[in-house]
Amino acid sequence: FDTLWKHYKRLIKENGAILLFGSQPFTTDLINSNRDWFRYEIIWEKTRPSNFFLANKQPLKAHENICVFYKMQPTYNVIKWKGNNNHASKPRLSNSNIHNLTGIKNGVDTNEDKFPKSVINVKSTDNTKNLHPTQKPEKLLEWLILLYSNENEIILDNTMGSGSTV
């Protein structure tokens, strides 16, 4: 990791963010490789789990960690979600199906814009159309780019497997 961080530190702007995808145990090694810059993680909840070859030994992997690193507060353009089941703090109602709520039910406004939470649900790509086995959904990448950068800024994707960020 030393060479990777050497080059990131050389290239990153003062208010730039470095986002890296991973899963355990790699995530722990990644965070420990630069504890000074690690700030938080976003959990991408996948709709299509992976690691079927280990299904008899451990649970399928239905999420990935997105580790966020930076030296100084980066650009952070808040992009609010509509109040639906993409949002972790959805109302908990005992006599209703919360996935079908619209408007105000039992005093809870479910159409209100919500701040993003640390767990996000973005539909996985159709793996029959994937160019790369770890390809990320364009919608997820678009959200992250809009969240952490401004128009006309340069984005480096040095882990570009299939070119989804293009």
Description of each model-found segment:
Residues 1-166:
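Core catalytic lobe of class I
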